Design a protein with these regions (language model features):
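Divalent metal-dependent phosphate-bond-processing catalytic cores, especially two-metal-ion Mg2+/Mn2+ enzymes
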Residues: 2-3, 25-34, 38, 42-50, ...
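Active-site flanking loop/helix segments enriched in acidic
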Residues: 9-35, 67-80
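Catalytic-loop motifs flanking and including active-site residues across diverse enzymes
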Residues: 32, 55-58, 86, 90, ...
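An active-site-proximal "capping" alpha-helix that borders the catalytic cofactor pocket
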Residues: 35-43, 84-99
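His-Asp-centered metal-binding catalytic motifs of divalent-metal-dependent phosphohydrolases/nucleases
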Residues: 54-79, 90, 112-123
Length: 240
């Protein structure tokens, strides 16, 4: 498959211009998408994918969160269970509405791209995937997790962030029992179980447990954001 990267980026930037670029959440998701595309490219090289498959992985990285922009404009939140499943909406926008052709002329990998976009946020990948399908789904899920570590570190370092909270407030919050129980099992946390901001913080820490590839853990370690998250100390005795 032939992917024109300049066209993909140009069309993605044009799409994002339809939204309020003074909104910090829109800026965040645009930057996140670009960073995830770079991360997934590194992961693809790390597992020795072909040049064509590396380009395909990169493209999935750019497009994986395209549903976030309309979600934020319509619902003013990034929490799917309070609004819309952003991954499914992104797949709908790209494929049911036909906008994938804005980005790519070649339709030969449409089904794989749709699957990877649609499944990048699920709690567990479905059974029955082919090895190739599973590989691309795991790559985008790993790349997404790795950049989420950066997002949390950089957002919490600022006084004006998309969660309207800061470290001083976070340090006093408790962790819900169900979230702590899942964390002790070293598993990812179901979003609907998260009640406090500290629950979400613990949920981010637990993403590391399910990185699929050794190169993913290596890259997360090298970037240092995950280690920064681990340095957090709570003023809430139960949480600490």
């Amino acid at each position: 498959m032939n992917i024109d990267r300049n066209r993909v980026i140009r069309c993605f930037a044009a799409y994002v211009r339809n939204f309020d670029r003074s909104d910090a959440g829109i800026v965040l998701k645009y930057q996140h998408s670009i960073r995830v595309s770079r991360i997934i490219e590194k992961l693809a090289h790390g597992i020795s994918l072909s040049d064509a498959d590396t380009d395909l992985a990169w493209c999935i990285g750019v497009l994986h969160d395209i549903g976030r922009f309309e979600q934020l404009r319509e619902y003013h939140t990034f929490i799917d269970y309070r609004s819309v499943d952003h991954a499914r909406y992104g797949a709908h926008y790209l494929f049911d509405e036909g906008h994938i052709r804005d980005f790519l002329s070649d339709a030969s990998e449409d089904s794989l791209i749709r699957l990877a976009v649609e499944q990048h946020n699920v709690f567990r990948l479905p059974d029955g995937l082919t090895p190739r399908q599973k590989q691309f789904c795991q790559l985008i899920r790993d790349a997404d997790k790795i950049d989420i570590f950066r997002v949390y570190v950089t957002q919490l370092a600022g006084t004006n962030n998309i969660w309207h909270t800061d470290l001083s407030r976070l340090k006093t919050q408790s962790v819900s029992e169900s979230v702590m129980a899942q964390a002790r099992r070293m598993r990812t946390i179901r979003t609907e179980d998260k009640k406090t901001r500290m629950d979400f913080y613990v949920g981010v820490l637990c993403l590391y447990f399910e990185l699929a590839y050794p190169v993913s853990r290596q890259l997360a370690d090298e970037q240092g954001y995950y280690d920064t998250l681990l340095q957090f100390h709570s003023q809430n005795q139960q949480t600490e």
